[in-house]
Amino acid sequence: MKFRYFYSFPQSASLTAQFIVRLPPAIVCFDSLRDAPPTSEGAFRIGTNLFAKLKFEKEEVMKLKTTLLGKTYIFKDLKEVLAKANEEKTGDKLAGLAAESAQERVAAKVVLAAVLLSDLRENPAVPYEQDEVTRIIQDDVNEKVYEKIRNWTVSDLREWILSEKTSGADIRKLSRGLTSEMVAAVCKLMSNLDLIYAANKITVTAHCNTTIGLPGTLSCRLQPNHTTDDPEGITASTLEGLSFGAGDAVIGLNPVTDSPEQVGKVLRRFQEIKEHWEIPTQICVLAHVTAQMKAVRDGAPCDLIFQSIAGSEAGNAAFGFNAATIQEARDLLLHEGTAEGPNVMYFETGQGSELSSNAHHGTDQVTMEARCYGFARRFQPFLVNTVVGFIGPEYLYDARQVTRAGLEDHFMGKLTGISMGCDCCYTNHMKADQNDIENLASLLTMAGCNYFMGIPHGDDIMLNYQTTGFRETAALREITGKTAIPEFQRWLEKMGFVENGRLTAKAGDGSSLLF
């Protein structure tokens, strides 16, 4: 802890000592009383000049150093502490932000554990005046909740979250007083099992046409991507996925052609399938937000509007939108969309996206990812998922880093209070394989993840990456005793695809849904 003492002096005085710091007129700051010992009169002498005492003030300054095993580690600012407290990530190394050794990483964690939540509030990753994501995060804080916890340390927050006495409802209430930097900080002090245990406490639901995130459910986005956007190919994958029990979260396609006309064409095909078989679900085409808005204005049916988001204003600008665009899209869908709502937005994120567009502001990728969720919360989304390994080994090198990032992102999303899923995936040039992705999906199921992806054989031939297939979600439901969203589960049973919580012999036969 550091103390500062403030005293008055004549504005005409000549003060040249290095320890003197000029403040507003007539104020001088000394870092210790030794710099200007008091006289017997209670005034303070600098050279031959005598000055009367104006005020005494104690200011607590963050202690950003620690000594471990005889070596002292000093960090220049809170941003450096946050970065170096991260578990190893190649993206942070690429940005020049990572700890140089395991010892330095531990030292940063020790320092971070003692940081006050108020220090994190007052030192956002990007200044309030410069960044609308920061403004959204800060303005959305519940001040009454924050005042109760502002003097907690990050360690206090961690212990409280992990306490057996703390319920999920307790965490949801407290989360309204957290900024994204606080969320990221506590995440950095948790082990993988801590992240699973804590996230599993938290239930976050959202409603579009159905309600996702209910206890005892595990949902799946049906992702029928096609290399040429061929309607019949898309339909074939959609029907097959439905027969395996995929699609209760959303039937959502990434189009090859990002045009309003193509968006409308695919949405109409999805709506035709949904209406013919009376399927209780949501539909979406994951084009740019502006293309989807144009399609809706042209009369296309649409339940959810999608956009990839970043943790800074500059990152979102690189994606071609700002907060006003998202608000306009949400308002449009609430008035002209086909969903019940009120949750009609779908966002995707992923550690490292800000660095890829040089929009990270010298901030580590976990903290920037947490800021994505703070931004998303403003717009009350139905779905948010990290596409955890999609960006490649330059940001997450191997299966170990992908697993850690997936658990971090899921925990941070739920702690922020959003309906959180995960695209457990990897690229072909990453040191990971399908077994690693199944491991992550299994861990996230234990953590209470709301949904995964479902793609034929887990191989997205359009986006050229690997993720979970149709059978993975079905298997995880059976193992854990979970089901699809209740209305969708009843539809599966009615259609004969599921019986007693298990897939039937009819599962996988998409031809049974041809019409």
Predicted regions and their residues:
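Long, compositionally biased, glycine/small-hydrophobic-enriched stretches that function as flexible linkers
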Residues: 61-203
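Active-site-adjacent beta->alpha loops and helix N-cap segments on the catalytic face
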Residues: 198-209, 257-270, 292, 316-329
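Hydrophobic faces of well-ordered beta-strands that scaffold small-molecule active sites
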Residues: 218-224, 249-251, 281-287, 304-307, ...
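Glycine-rich, proline-tolerant flexible connector loops at the mouths of alpha/beta enzymes
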Residues: 174-175, 186, 190, 250-267, ...
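Alpha/beta enzyme core
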Residues: 92-107, 112-115, 176-181, 188, ...
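Active-site mouth loops of central-metabolism enzymes
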Residues: 218-233, 356-364, 426-434
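Alpha-helix-loop-beta-strand connector modules within alpha/beta enzyme cores
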Residues: 220, 262-287, 328-339, 403-420, ...
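N-terminal small/glycine-rich loop or linker at the start of catalytic domains
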Residues: 129-133, 202-226, 344-358, 420-422
